[in-house]
Swiss-Prot record:
Species lineage: Bacteria, Pseudomonadati, Pseudomonadota, Gammaproteobacteria, Enterobacterales
Protein name: Lipophilic envelope-spanning tunnel protein B
Ranges annotated as spanning the membrane: 20-40
Gene that specifies this protein: letB
MCE/MlaD 3 as annotated region, ranges: 279-382
InterPro entries in alphabetical order: Mce/MlaD (IPR003399), PqiA-PqiB_transport (IPR051800)
Recorded domain comment: The seven MCE (Mammalian Cell Entry) domains of a single protomer of LetB resemble seven beads on a string. Six copies of this linearly configured protomer associate laterally to form a homohexameric assembly. The LetB hexamers form an elongated tube consisting of seven stacked MCE rings, each formed from the association of six identical MCE domains, with a central tunnel. Rings 1, 5, 6 and 7 are dynamic and adopt open and closed states.
Family statement drawn from the similarity comment of this UniProt entry: Belongs to the PqiB family.
MCE/MlaD 2, as annotated region: 160-272
Pfam assignment, any one: MlaD
Recorded consequence of changing A706N: Does not affect function
Coiled-coil region: none
Phenotype when changing V247N: Well folded and assembled into a hexameric structure, but loses its function
Region annotation (MCE/MlaD 5) ranges: 515-625
Role of this protein: Forms a tunnel that spans the entire periplasmic space. Is probably involved in the transport of lipids between the inner membrane and the outer membrane through the tunnel. Forms a dynamic tunnel sufficiently long to mediate lipid transport directly between the two membranes without the need for a shuttle protein. Binds phospholipids. Lipids bind inside the tunnel. Required for outer membrane homeostasis. Contributes to membrane integrity.
Length: 877
């Protein structure tokens, strides 16, 4: 076997290859970026120009931009003063892509926000600050410019139409004032300047591109700035295009359809207003007068719209007034043979509160008619327009005065206007009115119809205030005449005109109210014309006149028709006093009349039964000086007294607390050594109290051991009455006292005979088993003066207790019974002990004794029967 020898080995060689390190790429990249930034900065830097400004307000280096058409094209770099310190040099960097725009005619100006009533201009400057506007121009390249004071007129051709208006002055127009076509804004005032010849101004108007076709060669422009007002005594004319026009001024125009379109830079005239633009049809007018009319002011109205205007007024020989009117072409077809033009005066009306009509004064109203076209018209006064209607009813009304009624005021029937006052004439006997009633309402007027003033506002000023008497608010503002429809009689040609409804119902044409009743008074009370007439304090009329005579005064009264039913044959009149004073135990009562009645006076009346026979003097009724005197008619009585110390004039006469009369006079009768009191009873009480048996007594305070009675009479005593049942009588004796307790006034009257009065007196109680059932009403001597007659009255509810065999005795309130074995003392109440009393009882008997009759006499025992407590007699009613 053979052995192989390994081959020899070759040693490897390592070689290093040289490469550029990637790290060295970073400086290269940085160099490239720096080069690009330098180039970009160079490109952005653009061109630097200098702009001279008179003021640099709001310009900030590095912040204030330069804009063209809203695009930022540069920035302010630096601001410095010129060498002569008269201007500001602003360094501006303009982008390189705008380099070609920097030429001789390029313009710069400062844009700042401006606020006014018209609005805010330069709003973008208000948000982002002031900026410099730029308008590229032509010419050689330039890097130094002078800024304009305002925005330049010239604009690039973007489709807007620039025209020029010539006017004598600028008026209230301003840059930005709107231009209207049929109330739509279509452009604005771009700029204005004074004419080169110094005569007037030139106004540059820019019309928006979409409205340029509205401007024609024959277009007329007029000023609608602010408020066009023409104020005079005859009225005021106020025109207002819009709020913007009021604040910043405005221009309006119209264009004929057949005219050619206007071209840029065309010139037009600017008129004062629409009337001066002479756009419309001219018609001639024959006017009733020129009063209240004003050329270029008074309008022609149709259905509430102004369709024309009076443009000329002429006074012709003979005083005839003519005029010319410019009418809107849209209503020319209405101007025909039977068309009327009416002249109307403005009127205040609550139903049609057209305040603008009140300010404009008189107006013309177009009333279309048929027939052939015409351009000359006779103007009809508005108040006579109704006469031109077919089948109109005309009537004549007569009145003593005009009552404020004038031509043009309405005729009202049931609140609806049915006619109009046509004319008013003054005559020697008064005023005559011609009225017209519409054809459809003429059948409503009858022979007994009445015409009443509807516009009258009667004002009465007095101490009680101001009183307005009139129709409703709308009716007295509109005025006119009210018709009261009748139902019978043929229609008449003439009717009277009444001042108010009351006079119409009375058929009275006098200014003074009619006399309803006349009064006569011996002396004049505190009344005068205008004093009120009252019925139970309610006003029902007034005093018309007061006429003096030799020995009396005649007073005429007017009672309103609705209250005349209160007057009867029993009506009694008296003069009202200023105040009534009543002083009694409850205090001082003062009943004062209202101040107006106290100063002007008043007359009252009431109906008193039985007063008709004595309250007339001839054909006149008597006016009494006071209510007391009036109510005393036919009720005089005479009271006889021996002392007047407790009496006084005016002292009331009362029954159960109610005044039924009073004392009028006190006289001393020396022949009889007595006092005679003349008193009156009110008529309604005469028949009841002026009778025999009636007792009158003075009630005054009574102070005794038993207590104080009638304390309420300390301040004002009065006369108490106890009615009788005898025949009519007018003379009475005034008693010292009578009963005032109403429990016993209609009770049973009996007489108890006693040897002496003892401690008894009027008012001493009558007792039954200790219970008060009656009272002593009086004491007199017997016919032979041998005993005392004690009058007693038992209450009606207890009169069945008194029988023919009843026994009466003195009840002093105590008894003493002493004997050898002792004594007994019996007492009653303290009041009984002080006042005493009369007791009675009925002994038993079969059959039971009958009831005592009126006037029955009994004997009064000195002491009580010993066995009376054992009687126990049953006494049925």
């Amino acid at each position: 076997m053979s052995q192989e020898t390994p081959a020899s080995t070759t040693e490897a060689q390592i070689k290093n290859k040289r490469r550029i390190s990637p790290f060295w790429l970073l400086p290269f990249i940085a160099l490239m970026i720096a080069s690009w930034l330098i180039w970009d900065s160079y490109q952005d830097r653009g061109n630097t120009v200098t702009i001279d400004f008179m003021s640099a307000d709001g310009i900030v280096p590095g912040r204030t931009p330069v804009r063209y058409q809203g695009v930022e094209v540069g920035t302010v770099q630096d601001i410095s003063l010129s060498d002569d310190l008269r201007k500001i040099e602003v360094k501006v960097s303009i982008k390189s892509d705008m380099k070609d725009a920097l030429r001789e005619e390029t313009q710069f100006w400062l844009v700042t926000p401006k606020a006014s009533l018209a609005g805010v201009s330069g709003l973008d400057a208000l948000v982002g600050g002031n900026y410099i506007g730029m308008m590229p121009g032509k010419g050689k390249e330039q890097d130094h410019f002078v800024a304009l004071d305002t925005q330049p007129k010239y604009r690039l051709d973007n489709g807007d139409l620039m025209i020029h208006l010539q006017a004598p002055d600028l008026g209230s127009l301003n840059s930005g004032s709107l231009v209207y076509f049929r109330k739509i804004p279509v452009g604005k005032v771009y700029d204005y300047a004074i004419n080169p010849n110094k005569q007037g101004v030139v106004i540059d108007v820019l019309i928006e591109r979409r409205f340029t076709d509205l401007v024609k060669k024959g277009s007329r422009f007029w000023n609608v700035s602010g408020v066009d007002a023409n104020v005079s005594i005859s009225g005021a004319k106020v025109k207002l295009e819009s709020l913007a026009a009021l604040v910043n001024g405005a221009i309006a125009f119209d264009s004929p359809e057949e005219s050619k379109p206007a071209e840029a830079e065309d010139t037009f005239g600017l008129y004062e207003d629409l009337a001066h633009s002479q756009r419309g049809v001219i018609i001639k007018l024959e006017l009733p007068s020129g009063a209240g009319l004003t050329a270029d002011s008074t309008p022609l109205m149709y259905q509430g719209l102004e369709v024309g205007q009076l443009t000329k007024l002429d006074l012709n020989p003979g005083g005839k007034v003519t005029g010319e009117m410019t009418v809107d072409p849209s209503v020319v077809t209405l101007l025909r043979e039977n068309t009327r033009i009416e002249l109307r005066n403005p009127k205040l009306s609550l139903s049609d509160a057209n305040l603008s009509a009140l300010l404009t004064g008189k107006t013309f109203e177009l009333v279309p008619g048929d027939g052939e076209p015409r351009k000359e018209f006779v103007v009809v006064p508005g108040e006579k327009a109704l006469l031109h209607e077919p089948d109109v009813l005309t009537l004549t009304l007569t009145a003593p005065e005009s009552y404020g009624i004038d031509a043009g005021q309405p005729l009202i029937l049931h609140g609806v206007q049915v006619g109009q006052v046509i004319d008013r004439k003054l005559t020697s006997k008064g005023v005559t009115f011609t009225v017209a009633i519409e054809p459809q309402h003429r059948e409503l007027v009858k022979g007994d119809s009445k015409f009443v003033v509807n516009s009258r506002v009667d004002v009465k000023v007095g101490l009680d205030g101001v009183e307005f008497l009139g129709a409703s608010a709308s009716e007295w503002i509109n005025g006119g005449i009210r018709i009261l429809p009748g139902d019978k009689g043929e229609m008449k040609a003439s009717y009277p005109l009444y001042a108010n409804l009351e006079k119409a119902l009375e058929n009275s044409l006098s200014d003074l109210p009619t006399t309803t009743v006349s009064l006569s008074a011996e002396t004049l009370p505190d009344v005068q014309a205008g004093s009120v007439v009252l019925y139970r304090k309610f006003e029902v009329g007034e005093v018309i006149t007061v006429r003096p005579r030799a020995n009396a005064f005649d007073i005429d009264l007017h009672i309103k028709p609705e209250y005349r039913n209160l007057l009867t044959s029993n009506s009694v009149f008296w003069a009202e006093g200023g105040a009534k004073v009543q002083l009694n135990g409850s205090g001082l009562t003062v009943q004062a009349s209202p101040l107006s009645r106290a100063l002007k006076g008043a007359i009252s009346f009431d109906n008193l039964s039985g007063a008709s026979a004595s309250q007339r003097k001839g054909d006149k009724r008597i006016l009494y000086a006071s209510e007391t005197a009036a109510r005393a008619v036919g009720g005089q009585i005479t009271l006889h007294a021996f002392d007047a110390g407790k009496l006084a004039v005016g002292m009331p006469i009362r029954y159960l607390g109610i005044d039924i009369g009073q004392i009028q006079t006190l006289d001393l009768i020396t022949a009889r050594n007595e006092v005679q009191a003349k008193a009156v009873l009110y008529p309604e009480y005469v028949q009841t109290f002026a009778r025999g048996g009636t007792r009158f007594s003075v009630v005054t305070p009574q102070i005794s051991a038993a207590g104080v009675e009638h304390l309420d009479t300390i301040l004002q005593p009065y006369i108490n009455v106890e009615p009788g049942r005898g025949n009519p009588r007018r003379d009475f004796e005034l008693q010292e006292a009578t009963i005032t307790d109403s429990r016993y006034l209609d009770g049973l009257s009996i007489i108890v005979e006693a040897p002496e009065a003892g401690s008894l007196g009027i008012g001493t109680p009558v007792l039954f088993r200790g219970l008060e059932v009656g009272t002593v009403t009086g004491m007199t001597l017997g016919t032979l003066s041998d005993r005392v007659m004690i009058a007693m009255r038992i209450s009606k509810r207890y009169q069945h207790l008194v029988r023919n065999n009843s026994v009466f005795w003195l009840a002093s309130g105590y008894s003493l019974d002493f004997g050898l074995t002792g004594g007994v003392v019996k007492t009653g109440t303290f009041n009984q002990f002080i006042r005493g009393g009369i007791a009675f009882a009925t002994p038993p008997g079969t059959p039971l004794a009958p009831k005592a009759q009126e006037g029955k006499h009994f004997l009064l025992q000195e002491s009580e029967p010993k066995e009376w407590r054992e009687w126990g007699t049953a006494l049925p009613k």
